[in-house]
Amino acid sequence: MESVITATIIGASLLLAFAALGTAIGFAILGGKFLESSSRQPELASSLQTKMFIVAGLLDAIAMIAVGISLLFIFANPFIDLLK
């Protein structure tokens, strides 16, 4: 039983770590491409900024979904029922 709980905690930790890493890389790429496209066509900066904020919200949603899934695994572990 302890091995299932330990594996679940390690899995939830890895889930959060990779979600944070993916979000950070996504924000870095998004910010770089926004600055690059705004410097090429400054007249489209306001339109690009709106689209950038929409994509940034979607990137944050990925991390929030990972937090929800990891909290589910930590506090309401469905794998413990398989041992009974």
UniProtKB/Swiss-Prot annotation:
It is found in: Cell inner membrane. The chain crosses the membrane at residues 9-29, 54-74. Signal peptide: none annotated. The record marks 60 as: Reversibly protonated during proton transport. It holds the Pfam family ATP-synt_C. Keywords: ATP synthesis, Cell inner membrane, Cell membrane, CF(0), Hydrogen ion transport, Ion transport, Lipid-binding, Membrane, Transmembrane, Transmembrane helix, Transport. It is a multi-pass membrane protein. GO terms for cellular component: plasma membrane; proton-transporting ATP synthase complex; proton-transporting two-sector ATPase complex, proton-transporting domain. One of its GO terms (molecular function) is lipid binding. The keyword Transmembrane applies. Coiled coil: none annotated. F-type ATPases have 2 components, F(1) - the catalytic core - and F(0) - the membrane proton channel. F(1) has five subunits: alpha(3), beta(3), gamma(1), delta(1), epsilon(1). F(0) has three main subunits: a(1), b(2) and c(10-14). The alpha and beta chains form an alternating ring which encloses part of the gamma chain. F(1) is attached to F(0) by a central stalk formed by the gamma and epsilon chains, while a peripheral stalk is formed by the delta and b chains. Belongs to the ATPase C chain family. F(1)F(0) ATP synthase produces ATP from ADP in the presence of a proton or sodium gradient. F-type ATPases consist of two structural domains, F(1) containing the extramembraneous catalytic core and F(0) containing the membrane proton channel, linked together by a central stalk and a peripheral stalk. During catalysis, ATP synthesis in the catalytic domain of F(1) is coupled via a rotary mechanism of the central stalk subunits to proton translocation. Key component of the F(0) channel; it plays a direct role in translocation across the membrane. A homomeric c-ring of between 10-14 subunits forms the central stalk rotor element with the F(1) delta and epsilon subunits. This is ATP synthase subunit c. The gene is atpE.
